[in-house]
Amino acid sequence: MSKADYKKKFVPGALMVPKTLKKSMAFKAAQNFEAPKELILTGYCTPADDQGDKPWCAAYAAANYAENLLWRKRGYKKEIDPAPLYQYAKTIDGDPDADGTYLECTLQALLKYGYFDSKVSKVKTIGGGLFGNLNAANDVKYAIHKYGVVMAGFNITDEWYKPSAKGVIVGKEGAKPQGGHAILLVGFDENGFIIQNSWGGDYAHEGFVYITNKAFNEQFMYAAFLTRALDGMY
């Protein structure tokens, strides 16, 4: 697909970003945490979804999030419909008439529908530079290492519509900001992070794209995930 075709899949503003993050949800890496050189969880990802022109990127990220963790926990694939997640999120996000929603509201939807135990799992968030956190990449790596895949929002650029031939978002100079977009972070290495997007299986490498540390640090807004969602998996 062309750059213009992928641009049609992006709905500006479809990811809502809170002005402040609740202190009760704030998450930081442990002081003694040293990230492994590589941690990749793509083996538990279901095939890439295609959100089309629907402003549901956060709900698709939440569905992919649950699919990944439940496959790890229960040992089988289960594809989850993002529509009910989006619909419930819109009842609690405070702006029912606007397109898009917050990451944390879609996680609340997963708890509402019983995918994870709400008595055990709690929603946590990690702010990026937008919230004054200059160590966000390490915090995100710690969350992936400790709790599994992580939902994240980026202020994407038009480079996302056509990554490099190797499927990499490098953070090109002069790339034009497009607005917020939600994805799933499914791994990392020393040079960047692996993303599962919701723009179909033809995007980048079968729906997955790699973002360099440079681009991550420039574009990352915030992340959200559940603690202890995998409790009992062993």
Task: Please give the residue ranges for each predicted region.
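Catalytic-core signature of thiol
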Residues: 1-234
